[in-house]
Amino acid sequence: MKHYSIQPANLEFNAEGTPVSRDFDDVYFSNDNGLEETRYVFLGGNHLEARFPEHPHPLFVVAESGFGTGLNFLTLWQAFDQFREAHPQAQLQRLHFISFEKFPLTRADLALAHQHWPELAPWAEQLQAQWPLPLPGCHRLLLDEGHVTLDLWFGDINELTSQLDDSLNQKVDAWFLDGFAPAKNPDMWTQNLFNAMARLARPGSTLATFTSAGFVRRGLQEAGFTMQKRKGFGRKREMLCGVMEQTLPFPCSTPWFNRMGSNKQEAAIIGGGIASALLSLALLRRGWQVTLYCADEAPALGASGNRQGALYPLLSKHDEALNRFFSNAFTFARRFYDLLPVKFDHDWCGVTQLGWDEKSQHKIAQMLSMDLPAELAVAVEANAVEQITGVATNCSGITYPQGGWLCPAELTRNVLELAQQQGLQIHYQHQLQDLSRKDDGWLLNFAGDQHATHSVVVLANGHQISGFSQTSSLPVYSVAGQVSHIPTTPELAKLKQVLCYDGYLTPQNPANQHHCIGASYHRGSEETAYSDEDQQQNRQRLIDCFPQVQWAKEVDVSGKEARCGVRCATRDHLPMVGNVPDYDATLVEYASLAEKKDEAVSAPVYDDLFMFAALGSRGLCSAPLCAEILAAQMSEEPIPMDASTLAALNPNRLWVRKLLKGKAVKAG
């Protein structure tokens, strides 16, 4: 059985207050002066002070083996802050730090370790505030108002580097080869790791490490680095430094899922919901010029327009990609929303998913068997449900303590307003009818004989995504649904958490004293007219799931207050994020893919045409991380997701999976 929780570091603090690993019998940093050693070995060994002002790109990427207490990262962040203050006009504006950690510290131990370096407190406190849950995979932390990005990969570095997507090849400008000493932790210091470092290293990239062990030097040379010895720090005689002086060939391991970016930095986004809003912010942070075209007269009039939506992860014992994506998307979303400098109604009150029948009870039992961190999800017995939710249900279930609800409409509107302050241009009442290649860009034809040309286009227009010749074959479908708005009652007012059953019920929004209950589900429909039948069904599902409780029967839908919307979904419940695939070319190029994988060319896609769609019913959870993934891909930057999970988000995945098995593919 796959476990979804990472073992925390087993450590103690010695007489000097230095953290010491019990498992490896080694200190996390020098008892003498760990801060100065970091500056000497890693910053000095990679010549970063001299390189920053001369760096020809807006982003500098550092990768590290062994995050530990974060001392190297915090020291580098401090130096980068000082560089930016001294060189405000420099080309280099953002720092990206990638680090791997098999046994992450707890937040409490991290804070204790950071007490050693009071001068790093301004940066350490930001790191502690965003410290992620012990879940496997990549955790992206956006720090210093987006000037610093930290990708924390939790797990074994030798396993993780083999799972990295090809988009990370040759992206790293400097390597910090750190960790417990080779004699203490030989499993980390392998030729596989050295080869992975070379694969990720940009030509001209450097590396530095505290050790001078011969097998480390020879292994790095074998991987392709030019190595030399340098005087070690303090009492250490020698250390190693290296340079990647050659351009090594690294063939794409899964070309059918290859992701193409763009160097054009100017884009049009089609849409007006949460996907468009969050992607706009992510691209603007990377220096893009962004124009948004919305078919409606205002934002969030489609699927993103609800008053309240639940935020919690979608988990399944039998789908690893689903678990990896949604658990990390959920924790990223919480960090992202908490730091977002806009106001929107929300309450992180928790979400409880209830087992109202045998099937749902079995599903919850399977989720609980996955060894999830208690901070993510925890079992709750029937007699405790009333205590934590405020209402009786006579059901047991699973609680997501960090979940809750937010107002999608308000979030979308205010994020777009923030993006406009940062340079976003918005055009409302622009219904895109078709698009075609023109010169080196895209010609957009809107209703009313309006036209525009843009270098790059992103389709983020929900269920209307398949309305163009380039996207008409996508295997997505529409789902119409109605959310009922119900007035609170004395009993309903006691509800303290979002309840999920064969539907959902939110606590009241103090702004309007109403609850949301929903939603009806009509696959293949785009109907947005109010339905009395749907209104009654929303109420009846609640009663059917909790037949023994009186408060459910008191729910009043007679006011006919509701909102109808249409979602875009896929049969595997995962979003579609990436290049728009060329359906006809895919069938031609991959006709013999099952027999000729070794001869496969890169996935056929439309150049500079991207999509961000099929968020289904979990867009509040998935949209922030998907926006970050797509913006990173478009900007040719490191993507915060492993290769197999990224493949599960690729818009061509449902076709390619069949072609890899030699099965026929049909459109839609």
Swiss-Prot record:
<protein>
    <recommendedName>
        <fullName>tRNA 5-methylaminomethyl-2-thiouridine biosynthesis bifunctional protein MnmC</fullName>
        <ecNumber>2.1.1.61</ecNumber>
        <ecNumber>1.5.-.-</ecNumber>
    </recommendedName>
</protein>
<keyword id="KW-0819">tRNA processing</keyword>
<feature type="region of interest" description="tRNA (mnm(5)s(2)U34)-methyltransferase">
    <location>
        <begin position="1"/>
        <end position="245"/>
    </location>
</feature>
<comment type="similarity">
    <text>In the N-terminal section; belongs to the methyltransferase superfamily. tRNA (mnm(5)s(2)U34)-methyltransferase family.</text>
</comment>
<dbReference type="InterPro" id="IPR006076">
    <property type="entry name" value="FAD-dep_OxRdtase"/>
</dbReference>
<dbReference type="InterPro" id="IPR029063">
    <property type="entry name" value="SAM-dependent_MTases_sf"/>
</dbReference>
<keyword id="KW-0489">Methyltransferase</keyword>
<keyword id="KW-0560">Oxidoreductase</keyword>
<keyword id="KW-0511">Multifunctional enzyme</keyword>
<dbReference type="InterPro" id="IPR036188">
    <property type="entry name" value="FAD/NAD-bd_sf"/>
</dbReference>
<keyword id="KW-0285">Flavoprotein</keyword>
<dbReference type="GO" id="GO:0005737">
    <property type="term" value="C:cytoplasm"/>
</dbReference>
<dbReference type="GO" id="GO:0050660">
    <property type="term" value="F:flavin adenine dinucleotide binding"/>
</dbReference>
<comment type="function">
    <text>Catalyzes the last two steps in the biosynthesis of 5-methylaminomethyl-2-thiouridine (mnm(5)s(2)U) at the wobble position (U34) in tRNA. Catalyzes the FAD-dependent demodification of cmnm(5)s(2)U34 to nm(5)s(2)U34, followed by the transfer of a methyl group from S-adenosyl-L-methionine to nm(5)s(2)U34, to form mnm(5)s(2)U34.</text>
</comment>
<dbReference type="GO" id="GO:0004808">
    <property type="term" value="F:tRNA (5-methylaminomethyl-2-thiouridylate)(34)-methyltransferase activity"/>
</dbReference>
<dbReference type="GO" id="GO:0032259">
    <property type="term" value="P:methylation"/>
</dbReference>
<keyword id="KW-0274">FAD</keyword>
<dbReference type="GO" id="GO:0002098">
    <property type="term" value="P:tRNA wobble uridine modification"/>
</dbReference>
<feature type="region of interest" description="FAD-dependent cmnm(5)s(2)U34 oxidoreductase">
    <location>
        <begin position="270"/>
        <end position="668"/>
    </location>
</feature>
<comment type="similarity">
    <text>In the C-terminal section; belongs to the DAO family.</text>
</comment>
<dbReference type="Pfam" id="PF01266">
    <property type="entry name" value="DAO"/>
</dbReference>
<keyword id="KW-0808">Transferase</keyword>
<dbReference type="GO" id="GO:0016645">
    <property type="term" value="F:oxidoreductase activity, acting on the CH-NH group of donors"/>
</dbReference>
<dbReference type="InterPro" id="IPR047785">
    <property type="entry name" value="tRNA_MNMC2"/>
</dbReference>
<keyword id="KW-0949">S-adenosyl-L-methionine</keyword>
<dbReference type="InterPro" id="IPR017610">
    <property type="entry name" value="tRNA_S-uridine_synth_MnmC_C"/>
</dbReference>
<dbReference type="InterPro" id="IPR023032">
    <property type="entry name" value="tRNA_MAMT_biosynth_bifunc_MnmC"/>
</dbReference>
<dbReference type="Pfam" id="PF05430">
    <property type="entry name" value="Methyltransf_30"/>
</dbReference>
<dbReference type="InterPro" id="IPR008471">
    <property type="entry name" value="MnmC-like_methylTransf"/>
</dbReference>
<keyword id="KW-0963">Cytoplasm</keyword>
